[in-house]
């Protein structure tokens, strides 16, 4: 039986192979062609991946085996060079970050923040902004009444050196300085980052987190465990006024709300305070942030692409949400200009008077958005404003208000205006959003902006009028004036301690105070505003905006923003005045006559891609990668005095500007 079956199977196979049917043949060939097409697509992808991998490995091989020309090699780091020269770690070092650069992580949150426990909401990839923007805004905002945590939310500062080494991936803040300190012998036992929640008022960092007490204990511990060597403190930006607050707090008795260290605590524990980019007297950009959630970059973007950030676009109300969040941060109020018209100028005069605009057309490329704006110059109608600039007018409403003599300006008293009437803007038509602007009558808004200009003194009245709740809360923690009599008991209150014009440096004649900052970059000094108009169905909750269509004959007026010399964020007058004059020698602000030193770093853009953001940059954050500044900090930490590193080094007109400022010393 089985031989018969094998014979039949063999016969059928032979028939099919010898006499194949045409129809069957056709059906067999078509799938083969389709399979061939699919395989060729996969093969192409595989070949492409192979080419890329081969090229990558070839480049790696060349990188490791072929000598790199000297001109393409990264320069030797200051830490390596100083270590070779015998410079070694000596004084313990405390780093104090400023606003924004410190990381914040979530410890408790709403259901929308599920999965984010102990993950960074600030100071990382910022991917959560795109994934859940409203949830992100809610968790970074503080309570509008207390300035502390909202109920059910706990966001805290990231501890340790990682708190502010990088602001975002590949964007260093303190990392380069930390690495260079390590090269001369620093490590965890003698190097510390004093992180704190930079959103809070300085007093509230102690109330909620005991940040000041922790800093005091850390300084005492590092002093005791490092051979009783005094500590070198290196604050940056707002960290400078935060540490100024600490200097007063630590010696104030415990019953008066201080740290109880006693009058000699600073003299015993601190060798020097090396302030980097200090915002001692505030920054004008804090005004524009609180007034309209804007700065020069946003104004430029609006002039290039009108409507991009307006409420009409996708109904996002981006700036409205950012303004509501920033209005809950008391720390921003600490950065408002201090000293009033005596420091920043009045309607007709200012400290920079008589100084020509130092930036030529050619140098305007330093402002990236400004350069972009120039490329579209012929496409945009631009109004021209003639110099001389009136920098004392921190905010001017309209071109005429920025030019007219003060006698021709409106004499409006903001304090006499009513905020609310029957036509108040109590709702918007683009989703639920509320700000303090919603309580203002349209009549009041128009009067505020009608042919008026505001100085550093009157702009505070303007902010009190448009955001009374925010200013009442924040001004319980900060003051922005000049003390008449520093011995007046009222200056024992903590709200004066972060203002160098309303507090004294400690009695520590051997201490040194440094002001290190960049110069040669256009820095925001004053603004020209206009009333915002809404052409679409959405009605903006922010009635004012910088007039981005206004340009001057030089780069000192660009996009409605006037620029002066500085480090791109802090004008020279704010960073340098106290070391140049306010604390120079024995003054009422520096009763023990501790030495002060000015060290300026002239900005030089990066010369190659290998320099990243520049080894000679003077920009506000990038300066912490400046080789000259790093060398100065390392030498001070290793025991050098201000005279031994070269004393003052000045490129700007800070001394001349300081001479023009007349205050009681």
Swiss-Prot record:
Cell location: Membrane
Entry's EC annotation: 2.3.1.158
Entry's family note: Belongs to the AB hydrolase superfamily. Lipase family.
EC main group: transferase
Pfam families: LCAT
Protein name: Putative phospholipid:diacylglycerol acyltransferase 2
Catalytic activity: a glycerophospholipid + a 1,2-diacyl-sn-glycerol = a monoacylglycerophospholipid + a triacyl-sn-glycerol
Membrane spanning stretches: 48-68
Source species of the chain: Arabidopsis thaliana (Mouse-ear cress)
Gene this protein is translated from: PDAT2
Any one GO molecular-function label of the UniProt entry: O-acyltransferase activity
């Amino acid at each position: 039986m089985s031989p018969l079956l094998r014979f039949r199977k063999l016969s059928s196979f032979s028939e099919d192979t010898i006499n194949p049917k045409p129809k069957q043949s056709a059906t067999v060939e078509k799938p083969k062609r389709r399979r061939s097409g699919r395989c060729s697509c996969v093969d192409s992808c595989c070949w492409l991946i192979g080419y890329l991998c081969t090229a990558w490995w070839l480049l790696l091989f060349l990188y490791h085996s072929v000598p790199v020309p000297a001109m393409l090699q990264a320069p030797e780091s200051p830490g390596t060079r100083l270590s070779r020269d015998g410079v070694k770690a000596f004084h313990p070092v405390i780093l104090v970050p400023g606003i924004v650069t410190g990381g914040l992580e979530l410890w408790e949150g709403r259901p929308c923040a599920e999965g984010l426990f102990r993950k960074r909401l600030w100071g990382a990839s910022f991917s959560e902004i795109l994934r859940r923007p409203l949830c992100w805004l809610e968790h970074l905002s503080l309570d509008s009444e207390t300035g502390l945590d909202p109920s059910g939310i706990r966001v805290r500062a990231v501890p340790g050196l990682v708190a502010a080494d990088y602001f975002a991936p590949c964007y260093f803040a303190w990392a380069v300085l930390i690495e260079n300190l390590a090269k001369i012998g620093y490590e965890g036992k003698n190097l510390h980052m004093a992180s704190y929640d930079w959103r809070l008022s300085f007093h509230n960092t102690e109330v909620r987190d005991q940040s000041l007490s922790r800093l005091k204990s850390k300084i005492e511990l590092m002093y005791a465990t490092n051979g009783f060597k005094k500590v070198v403190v290196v604050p940056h930006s707002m960290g400078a006024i935060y540490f100024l607050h600490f200097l007063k707090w630590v010696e104030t008795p415990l019953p008066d709300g201080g740290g109880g260290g006693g009058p000699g605590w600073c003299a015993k524990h601190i060798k020097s305070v090396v302030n980097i980019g200090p915002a001692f007297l505030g920054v004008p950009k804090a005004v524009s942030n609180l007034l309209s959630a804007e700065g020069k970059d946003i104004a430029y973007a609006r002039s290039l692409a009108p409507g991009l950030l307006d409420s009409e676009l996708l109904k996002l109300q981006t700036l409205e949400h950012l303004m509501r969040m920033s209005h809950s941060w008391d720390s921003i109020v600490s950065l408002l200009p201090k000293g009033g018209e005596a420091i920043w100028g009045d309607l007709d005069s200012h400290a920079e008077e008589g100084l020509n605009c130092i930036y030529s057309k050619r140098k305007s490329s330093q402002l990236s958005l400004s350069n972009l704006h120039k490329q579209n110059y012929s496409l945009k109608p631009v109004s021209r404003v003639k110099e001389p600039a009136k920098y004392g007018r921190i905010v001017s409403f309209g071109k005429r208000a920025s030019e007219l003599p003060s006698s021709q300006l409106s004499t409006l008293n903001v304090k006499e205006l009513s905020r609310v009437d029957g036509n108040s803007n109590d709702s918007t038509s683009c989703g639920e959003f509320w700000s303090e602007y919603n309580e203002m009558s349209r009549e009041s808004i128009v009067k505020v902006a009608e042919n008026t200009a505001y100085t550093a003194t009157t702009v505070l009245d303007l902010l009190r009028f448009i955001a009374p709740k925010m200013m009442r809360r924040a001004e319980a923690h900060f003051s922005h004036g000049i003390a008449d009599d520093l011995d007046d008991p009222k200056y024992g209150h903590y709200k004066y301690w972060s203002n160098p014009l309303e507090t004294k440096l400690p009695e520590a004649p051997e201490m040194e105070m440094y002001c290190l900052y960049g110069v040669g970059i256009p820095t925001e000094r004053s603004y020209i505003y206009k009333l915002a108009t809404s052409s679409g169905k959405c009605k903006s909750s922010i009635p004012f905006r910088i007039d981005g269509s206004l340009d001057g004959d030089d780069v000192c007026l660009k996009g409605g923003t006037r620029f002066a010399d500085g480090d791109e964020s802090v004008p020279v007058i704010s960073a340098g005045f106290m070391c140049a004059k306010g604390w120079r020698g024995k003054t009422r602000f520096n009763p023990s006559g501790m030495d002060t030193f000015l060290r300026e770093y002239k900005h030089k853009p990066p010369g190659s891609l290998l320099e990243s953001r520049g080894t000679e940059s003077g920009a506000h954050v990038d300066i912490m990668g400046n080789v000259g500044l790093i060398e100065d900090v390392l030498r001070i930490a290793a025991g050098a005095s201000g005279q031994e590193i070269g004393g003052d080094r000045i490129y700007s007109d800070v001394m001349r500007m300081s001479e023009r400022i007349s205050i009681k010393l």
